[in-house]
């Protein structure tokens, strides 16, 4: 619990313009899913509906003994140890979420990859399931997939997406 409080503290985090832009894209019907490695719940807080959290969420906790779930202050009646519903180093990802992420990637005609170095596996590996026309990478640094992308934008994701949504609303 001390590690979670100290190292994985998400208190005070708020959605930014990038999160809000994704909500707007979802409302326009052009965004079908958000697949994220983040564990901060900011996509849901901002209003996205179909969020696939590959690494889980610090907002959900569960009992290792009986499986009962609760929030951060959850204390299980069975006396079991509770932990956050996040994938820690060396643990397997939730297969149901992985399967849905793969399905969404296979169905997408455009994939926006943002704010990731694409070096964390197995998440970076899932790009191989994308069969669509447009791979767009928005990142402030180079990635190993830049050469395969239709468009690479080296800038801040929040700024780029805010401007993109602004332009889409004009058309």
Stretch-by-stretch model annotation:
Residues 1-171:
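Conserved catalytic core of sirtuin-type NAD+-dependent deacylases
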């Amino acid at each position: 619990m001390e590690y979670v409080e100290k190292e994985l503290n998400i208190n005070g985090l708020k959605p930014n313009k990038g999160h809000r832009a994704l909500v707007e894209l979802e409302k326009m019907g052009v965004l079908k899913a958000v697949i994220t490695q983040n564990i901060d719940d900011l996509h849901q807080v901002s209003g996205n509906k179909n969020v696939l959290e590959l690494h889980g969420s610090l907002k959900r906790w569960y009992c290792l003994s009986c499986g009962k779930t609760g929030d951060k202050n959850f204390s299980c009646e069975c006396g079991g140890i509770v932990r956050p519903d996040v994938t820690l180093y060396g643990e397997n990802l939730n297969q149901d979420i992985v399967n849905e992420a793969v399905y969404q990637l296979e169905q997408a005609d455009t994939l926006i990859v943002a704010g990731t170095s694409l070096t964390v596996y197995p998440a970076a590996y899932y790009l191989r399931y994308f069969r669509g026309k447009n791979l767009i990478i928005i990142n402030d640094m180079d990635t190993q997939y830049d050469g395969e992308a239709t468009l690479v934008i080296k800038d801040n994701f929040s700024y780029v997406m805010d401007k993109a949504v602004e332009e889409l609303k004009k058309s």
